[in-house]
Structure formats: C-alpha cells, structure tokens
Amino acid sequence: MDNLLCEESWPASPLTPEPLPNFRHRSHDNDVVKMYPEIDAATMEEAIAMDLEKELCFNNHGDKFVEFFVSKKLTDYRFHAFQWLIQTRSRLNLSYETVFSAANCFDRFVYMTCCDEWTNWMVELVAVTSLSIASKFNEVTTPLLEELEMEGLTHMFHVNTVAQMELIILKALEWRVNAVTSYTFSQTLVSKIGMVGDHMIMNRITNHLLDVICDLKMLQYPPSVVATAAIWILMEDKVCRESIMNLFEQNHKEKIVKCVDGMKNRDIDHQSSRRRYSEGRSILSLLQRGDVMNMNGDYNVEDLSKIFQIFRYEKKKRDRGNHQDNIRPAKRMTIEMSNYI
C-alpha cells in the first residue's frame, strides 16, 4: 500500500456486489424460481413471441416423433433414459434447464439418426452424452463423467468415448442446443402472469413437467403447448387462465386444449410411482455395471449404425494384437475394465 500510485486509498472493506438480473437462484431442489427483474408486460409478450418463433426453428415435436420412437421400439428405452436424467439431476443438484435440455438433445439426435436396431447400451451412451453436453452449456461447474455414471446405469463408458460422442451429437444437431423447452417456456409464461414469487406453484409446475417429458405421447405437442397446458391444469383462477389463452392464436389454443385433455387422461400417479420405484432401486456396484465402451476415429454422423459398428472393429483389432484366440461375439461389444483407467 506504500507504493500506490496517485495517492489512491484502499476501501476499508470490499463492497458487496449487487445481484445480477436473471441469474438462477438454485441452491436446493425446493427453489426453482429465477430472480427476474421487473419487466413490463410488453417486454414479456415480446419474449413469448420470440420463444414461439424460435420453437418453430427446431421442429422437435410432432406425431412423426412419436411414430418414430414406437417403430424403433424405443418407448421403454426412452422412458428409462429420462428417468435416469431426472434422478441424476436430483443427485448432483443440477439445474432444471440442464435436464430438459438433455432430454431435448436426446430426442432430436435419436430421431435424425439411421439405426436399424437400438440396444440398451446405445441408448445409455446417448443419454450420458446428452446430459454431459447440456451440463456444459448450463452449469457453472460441470460434473465429471464418473459422477454422472455413478448410479442408475447398466453400462459405463470411457471418457474418450463420451468426448467423441459429444462431437458426433453436436455436429448432428449443428451445435444448436439452446432449444426452447417446456421448462424454459414455463418460466417465461409464469413471469408474464405474475407467478414468479409463488414457490409452491412453481415447484408443482416443474414436477409436473418432469413427469410429462417421460411420456412419449406428449412429444407430439410443441414445448410451449406442453408448458401452457401444465400451468393451466395447476391453476384454478379463471382470470389467469383467460390471460394465458389470450397470448396465443387460435391454432395454438386448440393444441393447448387438446394437450390439457391428454394430461388429464394420463395416469400421473402410475407414472410417479414408476419413477419413485426406479429411484429406490439398489445401485449396482462397479463390478456389476456392465461394459466399458471405447471409441476412436471419425464417423459419419448420418448413420448411427456405422458409428456403433466401430466398437466391434476396435475389439477385434485389440484381440488380434494380443494374440487371443477367443474373440467374443460381435453383438456383445465387451471391452475390458482396464481400459477405463
């Protein structure tokens, strides 16, 4: 302090910085609201209009998505993958933006790839990679791969495998991962109707949306429709309901009404019990956890089956180099645990 220039003086104590607007306040699962600054109605309506326009650019919903997942026999695989995403978010205290973004990446990537037959480990690899990507875009501190894979999976993957799979997914999605989700749209919508400070209703909306994303049938609706329908169901104030519907054109209103009916007809209790059962299952130890996958090389992002075939090739090449006579069948795609080190 004796060498200060211009005879400036140090403050007695550091000033407490003012909180920045729109920063997420999320220290626990019970706190899911954002600290929105005061925004006028016109600005919020503009934000909603921008979200609706952005939603059209991603085209990540519709009957074609539902039909695709059913035709590829991916309904159960998708459900369990999304259960794992939700459980991992809770275990690592990740943001809700992260889990909804990961689910969005998963659906879009799986839909645009050409794979004749999906298996459990393929789906788990895409789910792990999608969550890894989403956390890097949404979290201040990105969890390690070991932390992501700690619970709930039947396979473990090498860090190099996930890193290269990240590039494959990002290239396939053209690096466009900031899609509108039902969660992000719900945050905008509740700000418009003045519900930001109501923690209880915000928690109910978020929990309802977490149940909804696991339901393949809800994928036929745009995220904005799903978010609006969820808020509509949980609200009883007729004035608020009318103010919500007045934000949309007639075509959108009809979709919202249809989605509301679909949500009411869902067996939500059954879905929730399945999730609680899955969360309560005993966790497999590392020695029981299945196979560690490794992948090297450049692959065509248009054909997922070719990407996965490389595991068979790398396994056989390694075995030949070690002069091993007994090569596992190609369908097993098993790699030694030592490769995970």
Curated annotation (Swiss-Prot):
Entries under InterPro entries matching the protein: Cyclin, Cyclin-like_dom, Cyclin-like_sf, Cyclin_C-dom, Cyclin_N
Give yes or no: UniProt keyword Cell cycle: yes
Matching entries from Pfam families are given as: Cyclin_C, Cyclin_N
- What UniProt keywords are attached to this protein's entry? Cell cycle, Cell division, Cyclin
GO biological process terms, alphabetically, are: cell division; embryo development ending in seed dormancy; regulation of cell cycle
Please give the SUPFAM superfamilies that the UniProt record associates with this protein. Cyclin-like (SSF47954)
What highest taxon heads this organism's lineage? Eukaryota
Fetch the CDD domains from UniProt: CYCLIN_AtCycD-like_rpt2
User: Which family is this sequence assigned to?
Assistant: Belongs to the cyclin family. Cyclin D subfamily.
Name listed for the protein in its UniProt record: Putative cyclin-D7-1
Write down the species: Arabidopsis thaliana (Mouse-ear cress)
Q: Corresponding gene?
A: CYCD7-1
